[in-house]
Amino acid sequence: MSLVENISTVEDVSAVDIESDEYKKQFLHEATMLAIESVEKGWGGPFGAVIVRDGKVIGRGQNRVLLTGIPVYHAEVTAIIDACSRINSKALLGSDYYEGNLEMIPRPAGSPDPVPERAQMLKGCDLYVNGAPCPMCMSAIYWARIDRVYFGTRLEDTSKIGFDDEFQYIDFRLPWKERKAIQCFPDFERNYALKACEAWQNKKDRHPY
């Protein structure tokens, strides 16, 4: 049985202070239980995450790198995918995707803008993760427009057990050509690559994000 099956979330949040630390603790605890489950089942590293909106969990994720063989399947990323799949139009998730489906995506109430805010669907959400996010996950959190992040352990804590997230943050501060982990070659065929930027800029019906 999944460890998280024993964790209950209050269904009626009207009678509780959802902004209190005492209430929020349950979400960090659940993220930690998800992390432990991932370790015990051999799915991936010791990381779990939950996404909360208005005091309720709308998405859960675990590190599943070992299970899938996909190196980007970190807890925060899988939680974002889970949350978006729950609040998004299911038509967007299948092979029958077509441009008209964009009309089905929610947008601000009363907005005269016919273009849905497709890439901002996790605005108003909080993410809880048992460990400090790595640079990739932090970027995903930015792109998902999540408002707040709560995490338990520090980068130095996970560094001690073999995860080099701290080194990545240090490396990212260096200029492109001085980075140590990966060789970077900026401006390679830049003028040709700019054609894609021009195509986007010239597309009159583009969906901004």
Predicted stretch roles:
Residues M1-E40, Y98-K123, P133-Y209:
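Zinc-dependent deaminase
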Residues K41-G45:
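A short helix-loop-beta-strand connector motif used in the catalytic cores of GNAT acetyltransferases and
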Residues P46-G55:
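Short beta-strand scaffold segments in enzyme catalytic cores
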Residues I81-E103:
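Internal, charge-rich low-complexity segments
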